[in-house]
């Protein structure tokens, strides 16, 4: 099974890339984590609808065939770390690849969010996109560690 993080935006600060790389290498062989960064649509005179529609096309092209799509959305279902661990365990039992999708500056296309298998919220706070990548991979690693009885997570 693979966890594929599809994120709109290609450039992140060095600290975010370093943190991503650190967590990505911690995952076990049987749970691969992959980042697919897609280009942000250039801002200008385009409407928000046109921008997110263009980004949607890039996101869909980056998705693995037949994957479970989980959209990160500020109005998605809030999760605790333990609830995320339970979701991860279920995803692993289903054995399908899971794509967790992080939108661009204007979020995700509404139709894409509606079509996703799930919508989750990482926080009630508005976070920078680089921080979302790091927070997401850390929480996925923490969820794995809970399920594997690894000492990383402590109650």
Curated annotation (Swiss-Prot):
Top-level taxon of the source organism: Bacteria
GO molecular function: rRNA (pseudouridine-N3-)-methyltransferase activity
Entry similarity comment: Belongs to the RNA methyltransferase RlmH family.
UniProt main location, coarse: cytoplasm
Protein purpose: Specifically methylates the pseudouridine at position 1915 (m3Psi1915) in 23S rRNA.
EC assignment: 2.1.1.177
Species assigned in the record: Albidiferax ferrireducens (strain ATCC BAA-621 / DSM 15236 / T118)
InterPro entries: Alpha/beta_knot_MTases (IPR029028), RlmH-like (IPR003742), tRNA_m1G_MTases_N (IPR029026)
Subunit structure: Homodimer.
Residue numbers binding S-adenosyl-L-methionine: 72, 103, 122-127
Class of enzymatic activity (EC top level): transferase
Record-given protein name: Ribosomal RNA large subunit methyltransferase H
HAMAP family listed in its UniProt record: 23SrRNA_methyltr_H
Catalytic activity reported: pseudouridine(1915) in 23S rRNA + S-adenosyl-L-methionine = N(3)-methylpseudouridine(1915) in 23S rRNA + S-adenosyl-L-homocysteine + H(+)
Keyword Signal: no
Subcellular locations according to the entry: Cytoplasm
GO cellular component terms given for this protein: cytoplasm
Keywords, ordered alphabetically: Cytoplasm, Methyltransferase, rRNA processing, S-adenosyl-L-methionine, Transferase
Designated gene of the protein: rlmH
């Amino acid at each position: 099974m693979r966890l594929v993080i599809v994120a709109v935006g290609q450039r992140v600060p060095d600290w975010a890339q370093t943190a991503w790389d650190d967590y990505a290498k911690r995952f076990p062989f049987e749970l691969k984590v992959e980042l697919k960064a897609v280009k942000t649509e250039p801002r200008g005179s385009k409407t928000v609808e046109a921008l997110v529609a263009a980004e949607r096309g890039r996101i869909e092209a980056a998705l693995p065939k037949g994957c479970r799509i989980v959209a990160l959305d500020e109005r998605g279902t809030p999760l605790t770390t333990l609830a995320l661990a339970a979701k991860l365990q279920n995803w692993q039992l289903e054995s399908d690849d899971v794509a967790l999708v992080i939108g661009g500056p204007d979020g995700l296309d509404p139709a894409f969010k509606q079509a996703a298998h799930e919508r989750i919220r990482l926080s009630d706070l508005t976070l920078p996109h680089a921080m979302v990548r790091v927070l997401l991979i850390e929480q996925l690693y923490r969820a794995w560690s809970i399920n594997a009885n690894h000492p990383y997570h402590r109650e």
